[in-house]
Amino acid sequence: MTHWPSPAKLNLFLYITGQRADGYHTLQTLFQFLDYGDTLHIEPRHDGEIHLLTPVTGVENEDNLIVRAARLLMKAASESGRLPVGSGADISIEKRLPMGGGLGGGSSNAATVLVALNHLWQCGLSIDELATLGLTLGADVPVFVRGHAAFAEGVGEILTPVNPPEKWYLVAHPGVSIPTPVIFKDPQLPRNTPKRSIDTLLKCEFSNDCEVIARKRFREVDAALSWLLEYAPSRLTGTGACVFAEFDTESCARQVLEQAPEWLNAFVAKGVNLSPLHRELL
């Protein structure tokens, strides 16, 4: 049995710069990983079978991103003659990241499967090939596959590696799940934030264009941010529902965590520019 990190991410800023004819929104965002997340347990099989041993309530196994990623890699490696005969896997997951939280849990799970099985099966696909496969599963998957903090443009698929400060974060989940379309379909969502260079953006105060909509539509998000903002700079990650506050030290973050209201599920984690998944491969 092998064990693989599937880390969370934060969007340190997120700006919506437009909307394409196909409905997708163009954006500029800054991804950084956390040293906190799910763990995937993978046992290679030799009969060509893919088994997910920890199904998710309400999601058919074949629709789960974990299984879809495994089958996608199997198909791509097979078609290019790089899949050893009988390659398969038993996969289970220790879930710590909430669904609909804006921490990238599902995308991270898919990326971990692609990277781990490529290694375990010895398929030999490059990171570029894995990232291209990952993009077909979701716009956030490639950053997890590549494993380095990044400035993202387009619909999130154009990535430039960056090294923002590795701060400590108090991340809080207010107890609601926010489907991404709820935010992106809101008519009041800002959709024309001017595009700026990464150098300019890194010098500006960070914010998230989705935050005003999440706070308006979900009072729990508004309450969580109102509480966090009493202690430190705080904002929404992704389209929510998680919010985070940034601190220079772990002790400062933990002092605030001790004061968290009972209705708020929160944890402290360090921002890291190299994914814990990729540290495993070094």
From Swiss-Prot:
Q: Which Pfam families match?
A: GHMP_kinases_C (PF08544), GHMP_kinases_N (PF00288)
Could you tell me the superkingdom of the organism this chain comes from? Bacteria
> Subunit composition?
Homodimer.
**Pathways involved:** Isoprenoid biosynthesis; isopentenyl diphosphate biosynthesis via DXP pathway; isopentenyl diphosphate from 1-deoxy-D-xylulose 5-phosphate: step 3/6
Give this protein's Gene Ontology molecular function annotations. 4-(cytidine 5'-diphospho)-2-C-methyl-D-erythritol kinase activity; ATP binding
Q: Which residues bind ATP?
A: 98-108
Reaction(s) catalysed by this chain's protein? 4-CDP-2-C-methyl-D-erythritol + ATP = 4-CDP-2-C-methyl-D-erythritol 2-phosphate + ADP + H(+)
Family classification = Belongs to the GHMP kinase family. IspE subfamily.
Enzyme Commission number, as recorded:
2.7.1.148
Keyword Iron carried by entry: no
Q: Which residues form the active site?
A: 9, 140
Q: Does the keyword Transferase apply?
A: yes
Q: Which InterPro entries match?
A: GHMP_kinase_C_dom, GHMP_kinase_C_sf, GHMP_kinase_N_dom, IspE, Ribosomal_Su5_D2-typ_SF, Ribsml_uS5_D2-typ_fold_subgr
Name this polypeptide is given: 4-diphosphocytidyl-2-C-methyl-D-erythritol kinase
Taxonomic lineage is:
Bacteria, Pseudomonadati, Pseudomonadota, Gammaproteobacteria, Enterobacterales
Record-level GO BP terms: isopentenyl diphosphate biosynthetic process, methylerythritol 4-phosphate pathway; terpenoid biosynthetic process
Q: Which UniProt keywords apply?
A: ATP-binding, Isoprene biosynthesis, Kinase, Nucleotide-binding, Transferase
- Kindly list the cysteine pairs connected by disulfide bridges: none
